[in-house]
């Protein structure tokens, strides 16, 4: 059954435009409350990032949940993975995050976690969607839910993050830059690393409601790289607006993406006997990651793009490490979802145990040049079914001879075909991508 409101990561859009309006979000809170109230504790946690619209949407959700008879526990600015963790520890029915992740301040979204800290099952999302088709019907006055604010949520999550780093190790002597993207980790991440012994230079920690992800954070890592070089730091780490993804920078200013972070974490787990199974990446994962893991004898599998699909495949295979090149890293031995701070701590653990700088740890993986070309096509057409396109793809794959990949996929949000080619030689890859793109254009 097709979804009307929920995407792969909740409900998202531009603030003030449907569905991110106060009236719809209030109804969403009520609908979620109706579905969740059939269970036990009738408590729901609400966290948000630092967007100015978060105040408005938090109040709307609170009103809707109260009308359905549920208690709203407000945590204020809190990373997405913190909401997932605290939902479990509070024994709540669900956790709700108000965030649009790495998007600009004028976007926002609502996403849900179930009682065990994982994404809501499809059947629960569909039940909420079904309730949205009904008029709001408030419970009796005596049954209305209350709202309370907890003041120690950040401290609880800081202690959890620190607990994922071995107690016999210390970050003493390490100088690092931490860029919080003016987002939800601003009052948490610097404290985690400082309390573990690191010297921390913090940037992107002055949110004003409008500057989230604005020239800082994991989607703008040049600011981090520049600060690492300026301060002669050992490394840097940057988070996105809601703290579920990261990128890192070594002491030379080289930007380390999610694929390289996966490699570092997996190799360290193998070296220390903690690796269970293999690693899950996505269709967009660099082939350099696959070959580097292959050299170590570590199995690698590709899921569809999206952390939801990565997690699904990890659970299917029983593997504990997975993620995306965008920096969503899932370490199931520690968390139930992507967690930027926890993933950074796994890399820092590898630095400590191997007694190597970050630049040395990532040197075992060489990324292949990867070229992406977007081709717009007319609605109703299917260029991917054209014989000429498939013949050109087959020809390119033959030329790559197993030392590269071709991926064609439709955008999920606009009429675009994304042509991705990767291989060992950049100019060759560019030429191949253009050849395929021309055939796609000719197909309609």
From Swiss-Prot:
Q: Give the record's family classification.
A: Belongs to the phosphohexose mutase family.
**What are the recorded Gene Ontology BP terms?**
carbohydrate metabolic process; peptidoglycan biosynthetic process; UDP-N-acetylglucosamine biosynthetic process
Name-wise, this protein is Phosphoglucosamine mutase
Write out the catalysed reaction.
alpha-D-glucosamine 1-phosphate = D-glucosamine 6-phosphate
- EC number(s) in its UniProt entry? 5.4.2.10
Q: Does the keyword Mitochondrion apply?
A: no
Give the co-factor note.
Binds 1 Mg(2+) ion per subunit.
Checking PANTHER family in the record gives: PHOSPHOGLUCOMUTASE (ALPHA-D-GLUCOSE-1,6-BISPHOSPHATE-DEPENDENT), PHOSPHOHEXOSE MUTASE
* Pfam families with a match to the protein in the record: PGM_PMM_I (PF02878), PGM_PMM_II (PF02879), PGM_PMM_III (PF02880), PGM_PMM_IV (PF00408)
Q: What role does it play?
A: Catalyzes the conversion of glucosamine-6-phosphate to glucosamine-1-phosphate.
Q: Which residues bind Mg(2+)?
A: 101, 240, 242, 244
């Amino acid at each position: 059954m097709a979804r009307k409101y929920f995407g792969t990561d909740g409900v998202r859009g531009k603030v003030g435009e449907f569905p991110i309006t106060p009236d719809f979000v209030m109804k969403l809170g009520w609908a979620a409350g109706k579905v969740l109230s059939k269970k036990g504790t009738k408590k729901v946690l609400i966290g948000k990032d630092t967007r100015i619209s978060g105040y408005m949407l938090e109040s709307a959700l609170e009103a809707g949940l109260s009308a359905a008879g549920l208690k709203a526990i407000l945590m204020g600015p809190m990373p997405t993975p913190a909401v997932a963790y605290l939902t479990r520890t509070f024994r709540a029915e669900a956790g709700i995050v108000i965030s649009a992740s790495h998007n600009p301040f004028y976007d926002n979204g609502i996403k849900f976690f179930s009682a065990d800290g994982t994404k809501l099952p499809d059947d629960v999302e569909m039940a909420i969607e079904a309730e949205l088709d009904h008029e709001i019907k408030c419970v009796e006055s005596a049954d209305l839910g209350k709202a309370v604010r907890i003041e120690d949520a950040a401290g609880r999550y800081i202690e959890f993050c620190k607990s994922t780093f071995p107690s016999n190790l210390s970050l003493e002597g390490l100088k690092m830059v931490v860029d919080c993207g003016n987002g939800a980790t601003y009052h948490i991440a610097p404290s985690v690393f400082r309390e573990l012994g690191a010297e921390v230079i913090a940037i992107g920690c002055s949110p004003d409601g409008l500057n989230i992800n604005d020239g800082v954070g994991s989607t703008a890592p040049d600011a981090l790289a520049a600060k690492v070089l300026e301060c002669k730091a050992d490394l840097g780490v940057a988070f996105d607006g809601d703290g579920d993804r990261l990128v890192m920078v070594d002491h030379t200013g080289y930007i380390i993406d999610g694929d390289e972070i996966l490699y570092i974490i997996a190799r360290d787990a193998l070296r220390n006997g903690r690796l269970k199974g293999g690693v899950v990446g996505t269709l967009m994962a660099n082939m350099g990651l696959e070959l580097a893991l292959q050299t170590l004898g570590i199995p690698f599998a590709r899921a569809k793009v999206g952390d939801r699909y990565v997690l699904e495949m990890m659970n299917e295979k029983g593997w504990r490490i997975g993620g995306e090149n965008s920096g969503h890293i899932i370490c199931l031995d520690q968390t139930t979802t992507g967690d930027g701070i926890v993933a950074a701590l796994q890399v820092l653990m590898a630095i400590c145990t191997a007694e190597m700088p970050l630049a040395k740890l990532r040197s075992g993986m060489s990324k292949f040049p990867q070229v992406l070309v977007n081709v717009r096509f007319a609605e109703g057409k299917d260029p991917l079914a054209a014989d000429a396109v498939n013949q050109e793809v087959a020809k390119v794959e033959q030329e790559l001879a197993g030392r590269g990949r071709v991926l064609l996929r439709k955008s999920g949000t606009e009429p675009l075909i994304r042509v991705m080619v990767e291989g060992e030689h950049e100019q060759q890859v560019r030429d191949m991508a253009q050849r395929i793109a021309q055939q796609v254009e000719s197909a309609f």
